[in-house]
Amino acid sequence: AAAADESQVDLYFEAAVAGAIPIIGPLKRSMAGDEIQRIMGIVNGTTNYILSAMDATGADYAETLAEAGRLGYAEADPTADVEGFDAASKAAILSTLAFHSRVTAKDVYREGITKITQQDIRSAHRLNCTIKLLAVCERITSQDGSQSVSARVYPALVPLTHQLATVNGAFNAVFMEAESAGQIMFYGPGAGGTPTASAVLGDLVAASRNVVHGGRAPGDNTYANLPIANFGDVQTRYLVNMYVVDEKGTLSKVTDVFAKNDVSIATVYQDELGESEACLLYTSDA
């Protein structure tokens, strides 16, 4: 972007995030006069296919990844996808455009899906949720009124009543919350030769029109220059799965540890497994 500005040429990259879904253009144009508060996106088709299949079939991660490879949804080396690097790069682009502040992939907190188990998925179901790898880009306002940008990628609990919970397979979606426009969701194929070509062709047409009419595309303005928030300063809810000894007072000891660290427990489930118990704890914001 800096090189393009220096050379006074336009930079087009609609296909860089979510394939055929038009999200870069709306952020640069349609939403330019609004204040975006949050973006939550399913922006990687490989991981969404894997998590959707694990949820639907009950298969474990390794088995589902292998099937994704056979179907062409996963690369021979899927690291960039399953460890969240690809989604983090896209979160950086979305954050930069939405909050008019320079955000790089290194600024994005990142977790992948390789540690997700069927126990995690069952726990999500008990809470009427599903698990999605989300790219979350958020404007954070502190008590003194100062603002910062939080960008993070991690497997998140999505309530089954939320629109993003219905996005399955290799499809992508970007859910946006803005001060004036309210809630908006963009949905469609996030990868594949033809959908991606559609986005690239759209950029070529836009560039050609600007050449013919002597116009310029909207630049990547970072006038707000908001700082990057520390991940530890972001409050959200957590799902904790653990196995504990099945004896009197064990749960009390566990909750005491959370209380000593100022973390309150909203929901607790226990399942007996012989001499041990599976314990599910869902925290309040922490």
Where are these regions (language model features)?
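Substrate-binding/catalytic subdomain of NAD(P)-dependent oxidoreductase enzymes
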Residues: T64-T166, F171-A173
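Cytosolic Rossmann-like ligand/nucleotide-binding regulatory domains
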Residues: T255, N261-L280
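Catalytic, metal-anchored helix/loop core of enzyme active sites in primary metabolism
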Residues: R38-M40, N48-L51, E67, G72-T79, ...
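Conserved small/polar residues in nucleotide/adenosyl-binding loops
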Residues: Y282-A286
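Short, ordered loop/turn segments at secondary-structure junctions
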Residues: A1, A16-A18, Q270-L273
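Rossmann-fold NAD(P)-binding glycine/threonine-rich loop
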Residues: A1-D10
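Rossmann-like NAD(P)H-binding beta-loop-alpha module
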Residues: Y12-A74, F85-D86
